[in-house]
Amino acid sequence: MVSALREAPLIRVHSSPVSSPSVSGSRRPVSCLSSQSSALSQSGGGSTSAAGIEARSRALRRRWCPAGIILLALISLLSCLLPASEAKVYGRCELARVLHDFGLDGYRGYSLADWVCLAYFTSGFNTAAVDHEADGSTNNGIFQINSRRWCRNLTPNVPNVCQMYCS
């Protein structure tokens, strides 16, 4: 059993060992990081005592597992994509098509080019754009509608003419 421990790399992920069957059918601890135990045992060095094995185990628990790093990176990437799915940044022609479909071409005397120009210079065609004013109100969305009068933004006692939330 001691010789099997010398030859097999003893590695733990977090603090629980993961076992896999070896060639002889017994189970041995395995992980994604290898220790130097096989190199030490071949050169005659290394400790086979329980204290030596425990010291090596503690040292290995402090290291990051590459699989763990990959999982962390994947979770981070996915969490970055979630909020982005709620907002949209339009292209110039795409926004012009949408505004035309909603009948804004010629609305109140303003051409489609005027609406597209307004959207570009106020929000950069970004539907999630929010600008905070000095008085505590916010300008929201692609046309930067102000929360002081037109929509409700968690501030009590505002007119809320459109009867809707700014978000």
UniProtKB/Swiss-Prot annotation:
Gene from which this protein is expressed: SPACA3
Spans through the membrane: 64-84
Protein name listed in UniProt: Sperm acrosome membrane-associated protein 3
Entry superkingdom: Eukaryota
Protein's job: Sperm surface membrane protein that may be involved in sperm-egg plasma membrane adhesion and fusion during fertilization. It could be a potential receptor for the egg oligosaccharide residue N-acetylglucosamine, which is present in the extracellular matrix over the egg plasma membrane. The processed form has no detectable bacteriolytic activity in vitro.
Keyword Membrane assigned: yes
Residues with site note (Cleavage): 87-88
Topological domain spans for side Cytoplasmic: 1-63
Subcellular location: Cytoplasmic vesicle, Secretory vesicle, Acrosome membrane
Organism: Pongo pygmaeus
Post-translational modification: The processed form derives from the membrane form by proteolytic processing.
MF term (GO), any: lysozyme activity
Membrane topology term: Single-pass type II membrane protein
Family: Belongs to the glycosyl hydrolase 22 family.
GO cellular component, one term: sperm flagellum
Cystine bridges: 151-166
Chief location: membrane
Residue ranges of domain C-type lysozyme in the record: 88-167
Regions of this protein lying in the Extracellular compartment: 85-167
Quaternary structure and partners: Interacts with ASTL.
A GO BP annotation: fusion of sperm to egg plasma membrane involved in single fertilization
Sorted UniProt keywords: Cytoplasmic vesicle, Disulfide bond, Membrane, Signal-anchor, Transmembrane, Transmembrane helix
Pfam family, one: Lys
